C-alpha cells in the first residue's frame, strides 16, 4: 500500500546548529593542538549571548571566546539588527577539567584496550535510494538549505535572506518502497523587512519555486520527474519571519540528532555528536556503523541496511553487533549470520574505530550542519591559531566514514561477485 514519509533539515543559521558548530569548532581546535584531547563541550545561544560549558582534558590552551565569534561570523550573523552578532555578543565560558572517574574508564595500559567513553547503542543506516546511499527525503531537505545558503551568500538573485531557515520534504512511496512523487515541500526562511506581508509572501514563494527549486532539481537526474507541478508548497506558512536565529529561539548543542543522521529512517540511539571527541562512542561508533552500512549496500549485500552496536562504559569490546537487512538481503543468510561475518570484518573497539576512520584529527566543524552522513570524503588543509600566536596547518581527510574502501572485503567475505 502506498504511503507518505517526511524528513526535515535546518540551516547553519538555525539556533541549534549554531550551537553545534561552535561546539565542533572547539573540538577541532583542541585536537589540532593536542590530538589526544578529551572534550565534551555544550553550547547555548540566545539573544546577544553564548554560553559554553563542558569537560576537557587537553594540553591545548584556546581562546574559546574568539573561536565562538569566528563561527558566528562565518555563518552570517554580522548585523546588529539580528540581535545576535559575532563581534558584540557576550561569550561566557564554564569549561572545566574532565572527571578523573570517567577518564580512568577510557585510558588503559595499551591503546588497543581503550574503553568506550560511555554505555549506549548506536545505529548506522544506508539505502540504495540515492547515489550517496541516503534516504531521498532527507537528502532533498538538506540540499534545499545548502542551495538557499549559497543564494544568500551570492546575494544576487535573492537579496533579502537571513541565516535562519528550515525545510521539510514529504515523499510518496509505492508498494515496493520506491519513491514515486514529492507530495509536499516546506521552506521557512528568515528574511529582511518588506513593505507589506502579502508582498513578502508572494516574493519569497516565487523565488523559492522559480530560483531555489530548479537548482535543487538539477542535482537529481534520476528523480528529476518527481519535481513536478503537483507538489504542494508551504513557503513561510506562518507569514513574517524577520525575528529569527538565537534572538527568536534559544539554541542548544545536540538537539537536531535526526537531522544529523537519517531523517527518521533507520533508528537512533539517542546520543548527539557535536561537542564530543572520538573517545565518545555516541559519535565514533555512529560513524563506524554508517561506514559498515554504506559498504554493505555498495557491495550489493542488500538494498537497505541498519547496523546496531552497543557498549559498556570502560569496556573495549562491544556488547553487541546486529545487522538488519529489512528482508532485502541478496545473500542466502540470516541477518544473524550476516552480523557474525560483519563483526569479523570490522573491528569495533573504540581505538580501532579511531584509527580506521582517522578520527583524532580536526575534522568535525564540517559535520555540524547539513548532516553528518551522506557527505563527500575529501582531503583539505585547515589552519588553526593559538592565543600565543602559534599557527598549525593540518592536512585532514573529511567524512572518512563515507568512503567505500571495504566493498571488496565485504564481497569476498560474503562471496558476492
Can you describe what each PLM-predicted range is?
Residues 6, 48, 66, 73-243, ...:
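Glycine-rich, mobile lid/loop segments that gate access to catalytic sites or pores
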Amino acid at each position: 500500500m502506498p504511503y507518505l514519509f517526511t524528513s526535515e533539515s535546518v540551516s547553519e543559521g538555525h539556533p541549534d546548529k549554531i550551537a553545534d558548530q561552535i561546539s565542533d569548532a572547539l573540538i577541532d581546535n583542541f585536537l589540532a593542538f593536542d590530538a589526544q584531547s578529551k572534550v565534551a563541550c555544550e553550547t547555548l545561544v540566545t539573544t546577544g549571548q553564548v554560553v559554553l560549558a563542558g569537560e576537557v582534558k587537553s594540553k591545548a590552551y584556546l581562546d574559546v571566546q574568539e573561536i565562538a565569534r569566528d563561527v558566528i561570523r562565518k555563518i552570517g550573523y554580522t548585523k546588529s539588527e539580528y540581535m545576535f552578532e559575532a563581534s558584540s555578543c557576550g561569550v561566557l565560558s564554564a569549561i572545566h577539567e574532565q572527571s578523573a572517574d570517567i577518564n580512568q574508564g577510557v585510558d588503559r595500559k595499551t591503546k588497543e584496550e581503550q574503553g568506550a567513553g560511555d554505555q549506549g547503542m548506536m545505529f548506522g543506516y544506508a539505502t540504495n535510494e540515492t547515489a550517496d546511499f541516503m534516504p531521498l527525503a532527507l537528502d532533498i531537505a538538506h540540499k534545499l538549505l545548502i542551495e538557499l545558503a549559497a543564494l544568500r551568500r551570492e546575494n544576487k538573485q535573492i537579496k533579502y535572506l537571513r541565516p535562519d531557515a528550515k525545510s521539510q520534504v514529504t515523499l510518496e512511496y509505492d508498494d515496493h518502497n520506491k519513491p514515486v512523487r514529492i507530495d509536499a515541500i516546506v521552506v521557512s526562511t528568515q528574511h529582511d523587512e518588506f513593505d507589506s506581508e502579502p508582498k513578502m509572501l508572494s516574493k519569497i514563494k516565487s523565488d523559492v519555486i522559480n530560483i531555489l527549486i530548479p537548482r535543487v532539481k538539477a542535482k537529481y537526474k534520476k528523480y528529476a520527474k518527481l519535481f513536478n507541478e503537483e507538489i504542494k508548497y508551504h513557503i513561510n506558512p506562518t507569514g513574517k519571519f524577520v525575528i529569527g536565529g538565537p534572538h527568536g529561539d534559544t539554541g542548544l548543542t545536540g538537539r537536531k540528532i535526526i537531522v544529523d543522521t537519517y531523517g527518521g529512517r533507520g533508528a537512533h540511539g539517542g546520543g548527539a555528536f557535536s561537542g564530543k571527541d572520538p573517545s565518545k562512542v555516541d559519535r565514533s561508533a555512529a560513524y563506524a556503523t554508517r561506514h559498515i552500512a554504506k559498504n554493505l549496500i555498495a557491495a550489493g549485500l542488500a538494498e537497505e541496511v541498519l547496523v546496531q552496536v552497543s557498549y559498556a562504559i570502560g569496556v573495549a569490546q562491544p556488547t553487541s553487533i546486529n545487522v538488519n537487512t529489512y528482508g532485502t538481503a541478496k545473500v542466502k543468510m540470516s541477518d544473524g549470520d550476516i552480523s557474525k561475518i560483519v563483526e569479523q570484518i570490522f573491528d569495533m573497539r573504540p581505538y580501532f574505530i579511531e584509527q580506521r576512520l582517522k578520527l583524532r584529527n580536526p575534522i568535525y566543524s564540517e559535520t555540524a550542519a547539513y548532516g553528518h552522513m551522506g557527505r563527500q570524503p575529501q582531503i583539505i588543509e585547515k589552519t588553526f591559531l593559538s592565543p600565543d600566536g602559534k599557527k598549525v596547518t593540518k592536512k585532514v581527510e573529511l567524512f572518512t566514514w563515507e568512503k567505500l574502501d571495504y566493498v571488496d572485503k565485504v564481497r569476498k567475505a560474503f562471496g558476492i561477485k
